[in-house]
């Protein structure tokens, strides 16, 4: 087994998935809350992100790549939510 294979993070492994979920959820929640101050929405966005990781069985080369991916994904998901919410509010205001 090579060094790269030892570092690889495989989200199709249930134990590894649970460990990473527990390790990152609180920090990602705090990070997302800086964009969206609604705890329920933030938790939904994070849940969706982790469900996608689980369903796809994502693999990451190492912890740094995983961390960067998670934070970038949370940021993008928050910005998408904000954009969509503004559009929805704008359409409702037109009526």
Locate the predicted segments by residue.
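Sigma70-family region 2
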Residues: 10, 50-65, 84-86
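Structural recognition of an alpha-helix C-terminal capping motif at a helix-to-coil junction
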Residues: 30, 44-51, 64-76
């Amino acid at each position: 087994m090579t060094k790269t294979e030892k570092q690889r993070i495989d989200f199709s492994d249930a134990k590894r998935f649970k460990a990473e979920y527990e390790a990152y959820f609180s920090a990602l929640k705090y990070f997302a809350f800086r964009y969206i101050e609604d705890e329920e929405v933030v938790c939904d966005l994070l849940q969706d992100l982790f469900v996608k990781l689980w369903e796809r069985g994502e693999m990451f080369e190492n912890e740094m790549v995983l961390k960067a991916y998670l934070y970038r994904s949370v940021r993008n998901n928050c910005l998408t939510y904000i954009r969509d919410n503004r559009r929805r509010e704008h359409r409702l205001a037109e009526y």
